[in-house]
């Protein structure tokens, strides 16, 4: 692997990667996405940690947050900017009443552990919403199926890869 700052490029060593990262890499390759996942030197569990490791603003981290829809037990994925908090009332208005998803639900539905949930390559396709705040940036980074795995993309790529609508799903502070 070749080192790039705090990250290591995966390149041709895809078979040596964790299963989740390989799944994400396969989806990215099949879709013609120009970037492959990279493995960070250390696991990152927060948007701030990921941003620090990559040398970018926290808002450039695309956080993948899973909720559990109450009516049918479906997984609801909200992909939001790392410097924003999801407004659950806005999400509920768009997809129906949701609740928090525990680690077992997240792993069963996505195939990923919390801290490594990717916006793509889920075990079962979730209902997905994309935070419009991500479009403030030309370049963003998302988890690639492992707490150390990330990949680079544009917000428009996220929209194309997921087929999800872009919506106002975050809390706004009074100015």
Q: Predicted segments — roles?
A:
Residues 1-175:
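Extended, low-hydrophobicity, polar/charged segments
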